[in-house]
Swiss-Prot record:
GO molecular function, one term: nucleic acid binding
Coiled-coil region list: none
SUPFAM superfamilies, sorted: Restriction endonuclease-like
Taxonomic path: Bacteria, Pseudomonadati, Pseudomonadota, Gammaproteobacteria, Pasteurellales
Signal sequence bounds: none
Gene3D superfamilies on file: 3.40.1350.10
InterPro entries for the chain: Restrct_endonuc-II-like, tRNA_endonuc-like_dom_sf, UPF0102_YraN-like
Entries under Pfam families matching the protein: UPF0102
Name recorded for this polypeptide: UPF0102 protein CGSHiEE_03775
Family statement: Belongs to the UPF0102 family.
Length: 119
């Protein structure tokens, strides 16, 4: 059985997917796990593969959801994306892709979308 934290995470990831689909993106995959990290959502925006990190913070005592994506997390995100692309016979060097962040506050309605977060 999932812990409450995992259930909440799954709920916010689902809300992020619905939000992005409402903006015209199409779903490719979710929760792709690699030794180096996980890709929360993989979406398609026309000809662009979009690797989406979903973050949620109900309290700002430890920083905001955006601030929680530190350098180390960014490196894991890039590494996982490169491994996923390799399975598709692509790489970060030749694929048309970007890295978007979906940041939630306390509720699914408190959402912020930052395209090209790693630009």
């Amino acid at each position: 059985m999932f812990s409450l934290k995992r259930q909440q995470g799954a709920s916010f990831e689902h809300q992020a997917r619905l939000f992005l689909e409402s903006k015209g993106l199409t779903f490719i995959a979710a929760n792709q796990n690699f030794k180096c990290g996980e890709l929360d959502l993989i979406m398609n925006d026309k000809e662009t593969i979009v690797f989406v990190e979903v973050r949620q913070r109900s309290h700002s005592a430890y920083g905001s959801a955006i601030e929680s994506v530190d350098w180390r997390k960014q490196q894991k995100w890039l590494d996982a994306a490169n491994l996923w692309l390799a399975k598709q016979n692509m790489s970060l060097e030749d694929a048309n892709c970007r890295f978007d962040l979906i940041a939630f506050g306390k509720t699914p309605q408190d959402i912020q979308w930052i395209p090209n977060f790693l630009d």
